[in-house]
Swiss-Prot record:
It comes from Caenorhabditis elegans. Component of the eukaryotic translation initiation factor 3 (eIF-3) complex. GO terms for molecular function: metallopeptidase activity; translation initiation factor activity. This is Eukaryotic translation initiation factor 3 subunit H. Residues 15-166 form the MPN domain. Signal peptide: none annotated. It holds the Pfam family JAB. InterPro entries: eIF3h, eIF3h_C, JAMM/MPN+_dom, JAMM_MPN+_peptidase_M67A, MPN.
Amino acid sequence: MSTAVTITAPSVKHILLDSLVVMKIVKHVDSELHAGISEVSGDACAGVLTGLVFLEDSRLEITNCFPTVRNEPVMDDDANAAQQYEEQKQHEMLDMLRKFRTMNIDYEIVGFYQSHQFGAGFSHDLVESMFDYQAMGPENVVLIYDPIKTRQGQLSLRAWRLSTAALDLASKNDWRPELVKAAGLTYQNMFEELPIIIKSSYLNNVLMSELSLAKSCSSDKYSTRHFDLGSKKSLEKSVRAMMANVDELNKSIQSLTKYTIDKQRHDNMVFSLTQKRQQENESRVARGDPTIPMDDIKRIKAPQLQTRNGLLDELLASFDTNALADFSKTVTSENITKMFIAEAVAEEKVAGTKDRTLSSVSSTR
């Protein structure tokens, strides 16, 4: 990811997503979740997006997609497994694009999609993939699909791309605290979200309008399924993941604090030695003696942040924690609303029962 890349500011402002793409993504992810493939392999469901870019309207239209090859488990002594997997992945991708072209389907790659629970799963590999796609085309995006929210009745598809500042740091593959601070990069502006408009056919729109105007079934008239607080497991899982991220952030804060103290001590020491060397050289020049070079001072090793990817992991953990907190807040507020509604309905039923009891007693008298 350290290749020199000419960074071009993207011009796309919104995304027009075909309903066919939504159905294919949901079907792909749901089938793998039902089979337990994602849990066994540990990889997220992923695929490639194809479509067209309309620069005059600042619009990216995603018209089709297809899943990518899943990484198969390999033996420890198989050193060429990763290379074979990449070759197979590229071969099948090119073969699918060739079939799209033959069938007169949009075959221009405009991004990729991945499935992450609670919308939180941004990792170093995902950032590398986003950089590769945006280096290939500045308008390319990634669609993050949340199967948990979708199973609760709310389709969750969000489009992201790396900001210009994050793209610049990713091209250098250098996430040192000084560069991140100089770029003004935080977890809030590291990614840019684009609004999504889902496009359906005219017949589908007419059908949906008729269904919305149709009277509800009598079986659902008194149904209490809308009051079901069926999000306990997902909420618990979200809170546990958030606690794990907070623990990692606490460790990162301690490492960053230690690095800041060591860096300040190092800078003060280098400054002091430089001042002394300059004064000594001035006195040597006055005596006519040769000056002493400062190579030994420049060779003093600066402290390093004790993390593998600089501040990248901390930024991603902060972004994931924010996504998990938003999910927990949304679910909690919905559950509290349902509890208040259920309580009001129960009180109304109890009051109605008492009124009927009193009326029956008075009539018998």
